[in-house]
Amino acid sequence: MVTLPPQETNRHNRHCPRMLGTAAIEVDATKVVVQATARLVPQPGEAYDLVEIETDRGTTACHYYEAEGARDGVVMVGGTGGGFDSPAGGLYPRLAQDLPHHRISALRVRYRHPTDLMESTVDAILGMRYLESQGVSAVGLVGHSLGGAVVIQAAANDPKVRAVVVISTQAAGTEPVARLPKGAAILMIHGDADTVTSPRSSEETYRRAREPRRLVIYEGAGHTLDEAAGSLFVEVKAWLLKHLPGTLV
């Protein structure tokens, strides 16, 4: 059971148990403090709130792109490179700026420990809880590389998840894909020229997943799928708009 209430301010928290393998990571009784946000405009046309979520495990930083009154939200996470990295030539900032026009809020999450699957999953769950505190009741998750396993683990923790997108996923940690919430739709994307994570990782994950599911393999595309950036954006956006219930198409 995941209990990460963002409204709480008590910092005396119990240690979170972890389970890896066929069961999803479980996070129990972690209380968090959400810092006041600051509006940032890093470049023309892009504006977001900087959100810092404090726990006894450290501070998780996020970029929040709000759609006023949205009931749907999307959390995006990267791979082991850390920071606010993005595949496909800036897929994440592009999506994050576009989704609010469809009444979907977006949150990009920076891992505290980008090589640690469990801690990265906690970060993703914290992101979902932050969106919940902003009125979001249905969630989509997008993850690249390690982030593919992260969003599968996070989705298996929360029945509010309606859409999952895994891009160039690793195999380790994807076992809970068979236990996603009922009706949660998962899209798996890989390049057949990926030399970092094998396309077989996505193919095996697809075989274990329940419907609705979709597998897309881009010919000649590598790990970051820069070669397919345009069509990847269209594919991911269409999946989110189709499976999040309150969106504007």
Segments predicted by a language model, with ranges:
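N-terminal cap/lid segment of alpha/beta-hydrolase-fold proteins
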Residues: 2-69
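Short, surface-exposed "cap/lid" segments of acyl-processing enzymes
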Residues: 57-59, 67-101
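Alpha/beta-hydrolase active-site loop
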Residues: 115-134
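Gly/Ala-rich beta-loop-alpha elbow adjacent to hydrolase catalytic centers
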Residues: 143-151
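Short beta-strand/loop motif that positions the catalytic acidic residue
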Residues: 181-183, 187-190, 194
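Acidic catalytic loop of the alpha/beta-hydrolase fold
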Residues: 192-197, 224
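Short alpha-helix in the alpha/beta-hydrolase fold that links the catalytic acid
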Residues: 198-207
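Catalytic histidine-centered segment of alpha/beta-hydrolase-like enzymes
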Residues: 221-233
